[in-house]
Amino acid sequence: QSHTISFGAQGDYSSKLSGNANLGYSVQNYDSATLSKQDNLVTSVGVNWKLNTKTSFGFDLNRAFSPSAQGFSTFSTMGRASASHRITEKITSGAYFSFGTVSYTYPPSGGAARDSNSLNQYGLGFNLSKQISDRISAGTGYDYSFIDQSTGNYGRHVIRADVTGRF
């Protein structure tokens, strides 16, 4: 059995500052006597600040718990800081930096939960988008992510381009 309960609020503090917050609890109970229950608090907080009509900044922090029916679970804490700027009426740019940590737990062995490796994750990216017409937009961007864990480290580069049409 898996249960999660969460309460939250969102709102505008002023015309330039808005945000949201959530607080919850998640629990996974198992029918097996060899697997003990897994539970944790889950939270998220977000703040958006409009500096002016062209520029805005955002910050999000999220703690998530993901149990599985087989006894594995992940508990992650992720943060993201972002900025957006409208260069012209039709061109917008954005950038972000993200960071996080993920802890993995294996199913219990001999009645006790076993901790596995954890990882730290970092990312950054930027994008540029243009509204070509009322129905067509185009965008491009670059994302880099770096995974740091005990079994090895690696980075990933992604370059993307897209055209979207609405009919």
Residue ranges: model-predicted function:
Residues 15-21, 53-59, 89-95, 130-140:
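Repeated loop/turn-to-beta-strand initiation elements of outer-membrane beta-barrel proteins
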Residues 3-7, 23, 41-45, 77-81, ...:
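Hydrophobic, lipid-facing positions within transmembrane beta-strands of outer-membrane proteins
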Residues 128-131, 137, 141, 155-167:
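Outer-membrane beta-barrel "beta-signal"
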Residues 90-125, 131:
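Outer-membrane beta-barrel transmembrane domain signature
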Residues 28-34, 56, 66-72, 102-108, ...:
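Outer-membrane beta-barrel proteins
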Residues 3, 25-29, 61-67, 99-103, ...:
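Transmembrane beta-strands of outer-membrane beta-barrel pores
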